[in-house]
C-alpha cells in the first residue's frame, strides 16, 4: 500500500476440512471480513424434529426403512453440493469486495503520495527558481560594481597620464629655457697659465734638493702668493 502505481494481484485461498476459506494468499483479510465469511459458513437449514427422530428410533427397521437413508442421502447430496457452491460464491464475493476496498485504499494512498511528491517537487522547483533569480540579481549587481570600478580606475589613469605629460612638457620647456640662458651667458675665453716661472723654479728646486725640501719653502710661499693674486684678478674682471 502507498506505492506509486497499482499492480494486479493474484490471489489464492485454501479450504479447511469443512470447505471453509481459511487462507487467502497475497492479502491479509480484516477481522470484519473474516466474521462475514464465518457467517456464510453457518448452516441455514433448520434441525430435524426430535420427536420424528425418536419415532424413527423406536420403529423396527424394515427393508424399506433401510433403503430410506440411501434415498434420502441421494436427495440431500445435491443440496449439500449446491449449498457448498453457494457458500463458496458468497465467500468469493466477500473476497472480491475486500480486494476492491483494498485497491481503492491503495489508489487513494498512491494518489496522496503522488500529490505530496508533486507538491514537494513544485516547492523545490520554486525555491530553485527563486534562488537562481537571486543569484542572477547578485551577479548583475556585482558586474555593475566591477564596471563602475573599472571606469573609475580608467579615469584615474587617464588623469595621471595627462598630469605626467603636462609635467614633462613644463620640465622640457624649463630645461630648454635654462639651456638658452646658459648659452647666452657663456663667452669664449682665452685661458693662459699663471705663475709659470715660479712653477718651473719650484720643480727644479725639488729635483735638486730631494732630501732637503725645506730649502724650497720660500719659492713655495711665493708661488702661493702668485696664485692667490691671479684668482683675485679673475674675480674682479668677471665678477
Curated annotation (Swiss-Prot):
Protein origin, superkingdom: Eukaryota
**A Pfam family per the record:** MIC19_MIC25
Which cysteines does the record link by disulfide bonds? 195-226, 205-216
Biological process (GO) annotations?
cristae formation; DNA damage response; inner mitochondrial membrane organization
InterPro entries xref list: MIC19/MIC25, MIC25
Compartment annotation: Mitochondrion inner membrane
Compositional bias (Basic and acidic residues) spans? 79-88
**Motif Cx9C motif 1 per record, residues:** 195-205
Q: Where is this motif: Cx9C motif 2?
A: 216-226
| Lipid moiety-binding residues (N-myristoyl glycine) | 2
Query: Where does the sequence pass through the membrane?
Result: none
Q: Which UniProt keywords apply?
A: Coiled coil, Disulfide bond, Lipoprotein, Membrane, Mitochondrion, Mitochondrion inner membrane, Myristate
Q: Where is the CHCH domain?
A: 192-234
Extract one GO cellular component term from the record. mitochondrial inner membrane
- What segment(s) does the record annotate as region Disordered? 27-88, 113-133
Q: Where is the composition biased (Polar residues)?
A: 50-78
Q: Which residues form the signal peptide?
A: none
Topology term for the membrane: Lipid-anchor
Q: What does the protein in this record do?
A: Component of the MICOS complex, a large protein complex of the mitochondrial inner membrane that plays crucial roles in the maintenance of crista junctions, inner membrane architecture, and formation of contact sites to the outer membrane.
Instruction: Name the protein family.
Output: Belongs to the MICOS complex subunit Mic19 family. Metazoan Mic25 subfamily.
Protein name as annotated: MICOS complex subunit mic25a
Task: Please report the organism this UniProt entry assigns to the protein.
Answer: Danio rerio (Zebrafish)
